[in-house]
Every structure is written in structure tokens, then in C-alpha cells.
Amino acid sequence: MTEKNTNGKLKFDAVFADGIAKSKSTVEYYLLPDEEKEEHHETDAKPLYSYPDSTEYNKQFPEANKYYSKDSNWQSALYSGLTKDKLYKIKAKASKEIDGKLETGKEVTSDSFVIYEVKQFDTFPKIAKYYGVPLKNIMKDNQVMDALVVANNTIFIRNPQTNVPYSPAPLTDQDKMRIDGALMGRGLHCEFGFEPVNLNTGNFYMDQSDVTMNELNGEFSITRSYNSKGTDQHSMFGRGWSFNYDQSLSQMEDGSLLYMRGDGSYLIFDKNEDGSYTAPDGYVYDLKAVSYKDTDHDYIGWELTDADQSIWSFDKYGILRYVTDVNGFKTVLDYDDDYNLSKITTPSGKTFGVKQDKFGHIKELSLPDGGKVTYKYDEQGNLISVTDPNGTTKEYQYDDDSRMTSWKDENGNTVVKNTYDKEGRVVEQTDAEKGTATFKYGKNSTTTTDNEGNKTVYHYDDQYRTTSIEYPDGTTCEKTYNAENQLASETTAAGTKSYTYDAFGNVATETREDGKTASYTYNDQNKLTSVTGYNGATVTYSYDGNGNMVTSTKPDGTAITYTYDDKHRMVSQTDGRGVTTTYSYDGPNMTGYVDGNGAAWGFTYDAMNRAVTMTDPLGNVTSNSYDANGNLTS
């Protein structure tokens, strides 16, 4: 249960478990590790699905989220006051007297979880990466209303992979150009903090998604990114903005290619004597020229393959036309005769219509369900408002140099205010809770002071890679890099943690402070094939020719197997006991599954691939409804 609001507040209050057991059985449960050796708790399983029921708990935590769908027939008591950074899980088993004999079911274990207190310089993507969990899971579990994370928030992390708390030669002008370009967006080896600011460069950077939906190749989104140091760039969303499908290639005088990325950054690929191209150090890309036929002529275009084996196809003008993932699922971009983007078609055939004004700015985005997102610009080409399908509007304000000075959310609340120096760096920032942070820039260092007076110093080299951090409590963290521009080591008071990599940039080994090493291997698609932990135990993975995982084998030899259909959707999963669950689909949406006991579940979806009904094995139907923005309303 989490308290939240549109100003970025997220406060974890408590957690409870619920599940399905035989009607009128007694469910015994306890929290690990706190109650492992103490008296366990009991509750009765109801005849009907009555849980989760947050009514009673909302009296204790009135601002916490509420649950409406009823998916289970028992529920635990509330666990609150949990210790941060401690790994928890809940165990339960049911028993029932049948014909005078007590029958007890198998003990089951919930997902593990930790409670994390957000630090001053965190962002949700960094938190997700550190804990090794999908970002969307964190956002969903905590029902995040604003993607800006606020220091001292407490959040729920499900199934974390850890519960451990968190002088070269002068550069030429061309070197500086390469570095400046790569530092836009989420600059490699840079620190980000506050709302957020690149603490190595002073660039204010943020991204906002106007639409997200489930697709055959995962989550499809249209996401805008803003860079305060990129205001000389004019994109489809105005000055300083970019979006994930606004990508292009252009050629430089020396034959090298400049790749403009969707987050506003750019990379320069050197052209070799044999005509091939080399990516900058630290980036896993393969860029090659290809020939293709357009009407009656052959043309040269380019294909860019990333670390996930997705292929980004550019035409003769260097304009992005297709994105094809490792399984062959293709996202298509169509343009009119004037090369205005007219529509984006997802792998399952969903179409997003695009209208642009005479300046090439996107003014309207039409959605598959008939909804629309509209955009307005000022005379300088700055994006000043975005109105969502619900009719609510975000607003953006800029200074005379088109640097964003503030923006307001859909409720009219000012989320952030920025003040810049003459070099375009953020020197003062006020957040939604009126907390003000300051930034002082020195030679190869930045000193930040938060609203409580805590000072942190960030040091970086001439490539703006973080080399050390001095924290308010006097502790430090030092970082080194190898010749391929990859993080080689991190040294703190606890010791040094070091990393090695394979030829494709994948982490091959991690050696922690006590000298123990974990190792990783990969196949030719950069898919993880084995993990040998610090304790020497190895988990292995195998894949079919399309890159779908077909087995995962634990150290004891127990294997889980998976099968897929011709669209690479998982249609069965068999666990180590031989119990099989089967799945059925309509396009990207799972329409049903049957578990190992023969219990069947069914689902239906709307035009935006959102679940609208769920039918449980007892025939009970739960319905969901959404507003025009896709927010669950009932």
C-alpha cells in the first residue's frame, strides 16, 4: 500500500498477501525473515472471491491506494513498519479437515521484495537497473503518477536481484563535438540528480511518454525527450525536444556518419578504409550500408543493429523507416511526399496517425481507439503545451534562449523551475515541494547543495566521465574506465568492485570487494547463457534460433522449459515438476491460460490492448474501465 500524489510523493506504508485456497480451509502464513521462528498467523479462506480488500486498511492509511477487483479468497493481516533494504517474502500453506482427516497443502512463497528509500540523485531508471528489475514493474507496483522521483520517497521493489543499499591530452574540436553529442540525453558514465540534471554537464534532461501500449515486441511507446543544451536542434516536437522515432543519419565531410538518437544525443561513426563503420568506444552498434530498390532504381541506405539485435533501417536520405526486432517484428514509419511523418504502424497493425504543421512540428497524434494528443508551439518553435485524450494539458515555459525554465502538470502544479548560467547550465532548481538545490561548476567538478544544505562533489575527466564522488558524510566513490570506455572499477570504503567485458560489451565478470567473482556468458545474439554466482553455483539458459528462451536450468539441474508459436509468443511453460501451463493469444494480448490443474482464465482487451475483462476459473468476471488517458477508473 503506497501513498502518492501528482507532486511526486511516493510513500510505502504496508504490504499484505492474498491468494486462493480451498474454500473454508485455514491458511497459515508468516513473514520472512522476521517471523520465521515466531508464532504464525492464521486466517480462513472464504467460499467466494472477496479479496484483496483494502477497506479496513484504508482507515489506517487513508491516502494509500485502493483495490477494487476481487481475485482471491483469503488475505493476510497488514505488515507495516518494515525495515528498509531488507529482503522480505511471505510464506503460506492451507489445511482443511476432510472426512475426519486433516489435509495440508504445499507451502507457497510470495515474490521477494525490499523497501527502498530514494536518494537525492536517483531516477526510476537508475533504481530499476540497480535492482535488476523491469522499470515498468516498479512504476506499476507503486502506481506512479509522475515519473520524477523525489528524494526520501519510499518505494516497493518486487523480486530485486540485490538488497544491498546503492589526466589525458587536450581534446581537439572534433573530439569535443563527439563528446558533446554523446552527452545529450542519458550521457554514458554521467551522474544524474534532482529533476533531473546531468551533474557532469549541467544539462536539464527529461522524457515524457504520450502513449504506451502492449505489443508483440514488448511495450510500444511514443516518448518525447528534452535537453536544455540541445535548443539549437529543431525536431518534430520543437527546439530542444526529440522523440524515440525521430532518428536519422547524416554524413560529415570526412565520410563519417552522424547518428541522431531518439533522446537528443548523437554519435559519430568513423568510416574505415574498407567502407565499414566503427561505433564510438563504449557503444554496442553495428552500422552498415545496404542496397534496396525504390521504384525502378537501386539506392544505398543503412542498417544499424543495436545490442538487442534490433535493426534500425534508414533510407537514402538517412530517415528512419523501419525498426525490426530480433524476432522479425517490424514497426513501420510512413511519410508523405514532403517527408512529413504521416503514421506509425506497430507490429500487430495498430496505427498512430500523425499530423504536422508547416514547420514540420507534430500538431496531432491520433490513437487506435480514436483518442487524440495535440501539441502547440510558440513563434520560436518551442513546444508550449500537450493536451492528452482526456483534455488535460501540460504546459512548458522557456527563456529567450529556448531553455525550459519551468513546466506544469495536468493539474496546473509547477513541477520544476530552472535557472541557467550563461553557458546554459542549471545553477538553481526548485522542485514541486518548493525544495531548492544549487549547482556550482568548477574545473572538472560540480558541487551540488540540496535544500537541507548537504553538499556533494562530482569529479569528471575531460570526456565528462565521472571519476569520483564526495558524499556529504565524507565517504567517497572512485571510478575507472578501460580502453573501450567501459566502467572498469568502483572503489568505496568497502573496497573495490571490478568488471570485465566480452568483445560485444557484455559484462563477463564482476569481482566484488571480498575478491569473489561472478561470471556471465552469452550467445551470438548477446543472450545470457549462464550465470555463475559468487558462491560458484551456475544457472544456464538456452534459446531457439529465434532467440526465444527454451530452457532455464538451476544449479541442482531442475529445468523450466518453454515453447512458442510462430509469432514468438510463449504458449507453454513446464516447471521442474513437470507441471505445464498453456497460454493463448490474440495478437500481442494473452486471451487466456490454463494452469497445471486445468483451471482456465480468460481475458479480453480494448483497441489500446488494455485488459477490459478477466474471467476466473469459477466463471466470475471482473471488468476494468479506463479514462481516455488509459488510467484505470474501475
Enumerate the predicted regions with their spans.
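Short, compositionally biased P/S/T/A/G/V-rich stretches that sit at domain boundaries
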Residues: 1-7
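Aromatic sugar-binding surface patches on proteins
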Residues: 56-77
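Surface-exposed, short loops/turns at beta-strand junctions within beta-sandwich domains
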Residues: 78-87
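Primarily a LysM-type cell-wall glycan-binding module
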Residues: 111-134
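Extended charged/polar low-complexity repeat regions
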Residues: 222, 228-634
